[in-house]
UniProtKB/Swiss-Prot annotation:
Keywords recorded for this protein, A-Z: Antimicrobial, Disulfide bond, Fungicide, Plant defense, Secreted, Signal
Primary subcellular site in the record, as a coarse category: secreted
InterPro entries: SCRL (IPR010682)
Protein's gene: SCRL6
Source organism of this protein record: Arabidopsis thaliana
Protein name, per record: Defensin-like protein 247
Compartment list: Secreted
């Protein structure tokens, strides 16, 4: 019985410790920067105009983690209604 109680307390301790450890890693990052990549797309306000691909790269680079800027990235800009653009960077390398 005593062994079971010690085992249970140890399991709970390690469970709490590991969840706090993973949360602490996220807190060390700048909250305005994204490590990014789930979809490689993001919606912004604006209009693509003649140079939408460069505009998308500039907008996305401003919100990405700096490690992504070292890779060669090309983006596509698609204009949507209500002054919205969809920026897509399919060849982006995720960390």
């Amino acid at each position: 019985m005593k062994f079971a109680a010690i085992f249970l307390v140890t399991c709970v301790f390690f469970s709490l410790f590991s969840s706090n450890l993973s949360q602490g890693e996220k807190l060390s990052m700048d909250p305005t920067r994204r490590p990014w990549c789930p979809s490689k797309k993001q919606m912004f306000g604006g209009n693509c105009g003649n140079d939408g691909d460069s505009l998308c790269l500039m907008l996305l680079a401003a919100s990405w983690d700096e490690s992504l800027r070292h890779s060669s990235i090309s983006c596509n800009c698609t204009t949507y209604p209500n002054y919205k653009i969809l920026c897509s960077c399919p060849n982006m390398i995720c960390p």
